[in-house]
Amino acid sequence: PFTQGFRQGWGNSHALVEGAYEMLQTLHQRGYKLYAASNSFGHLQRMRLQLAGVLPFFEGTYISMDIGYDKPDRRFYDFALNDAHLSADEVLMVGDSMTTDIIGAQQVGIDTCWFNPTHRPIGTTQPTYEIHDLLSLLTVLP
């Protein structure tokens, strides 16, 4: 059926945003613990990360279909923090969605970095940081 074909095709899609591999590799080498957080299907998202060659950079993955809550539900973030044994002040959420990533993380006290490659207006919610290319994150996290 269409849904199965869509999921399989989506799972095989693994092109990275420019600078993503270098950014993840550098942060991993600097000793940062990296976690992926996504609203998607767990096995498909992990397959995409594996095919892109970046899964080894992550300590863990937090996927909505596995957890039972979607971002921006605070229970998603609470689960991830608890599971990773981290407090909100030890985490920086980097994401491209103002609603699910930035607002969701802020509601539990996590600092945020909005990846905004198209220079969209920020609006009323202010992220802690804003970057327009992923390699800029390397200056935010020395």
For each feature predicted by the language model, list its residue ranges.
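Metal-dependent phosphoesterase signature
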Residues: 1-19
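Asp-based, Mg2+/Mn2+-dependent phosphohydrolase catalytic module
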Residues: 21, 25-28, 33-142
